[in-house]
Amino acid sequence: MESEARVSELGRQGDPIRSPAKRDPARKDRILAAAADLVARHGYHAVGMADIGAAAGIVGSGIYRHFDSKAALLSALLEQLMDEMERSAAAVVAQADDDRDALERLVTTHVRFAIEDRRLLQVYYREAHHLPEEALRGLRRAQRHYIEEWVIALAPLRRELSDAELRVVVHAALGTTQAVLFHHSGLPADRLAELLEDMGRRCLGLPERAPTE
């Protein structure tokens, strides 16, 4: 009996130790991309977790291994957007030669986001109010940081404006890109970007660019 017990104990000790299943980052990205597309097209309330999982190729409840609720998914989606926008803004400002160059780069980068990440920005403008209060506060805080990059660059160029006026001008410049989010112009992306950048620059009061040959 003692020998059998020892063999049994050794058998248990020899059993392979299973590590917890790892989350696949690519799968999480697929979920976020599917959520952005579905929520942008149908609205937050009309889309369920099962719909998002199916669109991402996730079977059954696998989506809950990454997000415990639809609100958590929306929060992650918009947090990812603002993180990327903040990083890009900081990077282009750091590369700029002067304040005017910084604003030029900010306009170009923001227009690129509006065209390339149209679905994400649609969700941001239409559905952010569905976030839990704490997540919404964090999103608004990130938005203020993003706008601050623009205000800091604009202030030396528009010294006649007060701080409040500078922020109005920046919001107006950012608002020029919203038309592309909800209106399909049919224009080629390059031409659309050119128009949007021109409108943004005009809002900021930047001089016209010299025509390219």
Segment roles from a protein language model:
Residues 114-134, 182:
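Amphipathic alpha-helical segments used for helix-helix packing
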Residues 133-158, 167-168, 194:
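Amphipathic alpha-helical packing segments from all-alpha helical-bundle domains
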Residues 36-39, 85-86, 103-107, 114, ...:
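Short, structured motif recognition centered on aromatic/hydrophobic residues
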Residues 4-6, 10, 162-183, 191-203:
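Hydrophobic alpha-helical segments that form the core
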Residues 30, 34-72:
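Helix-turn-helix
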Residues 27-35, 52, 77-81, 85, ...:
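Generic hydrophobic, amphipathic alpha-helix propensity
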Residues 1-26, 210-213:
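N-terminal intrinsically disordered/low-complexity leader segments
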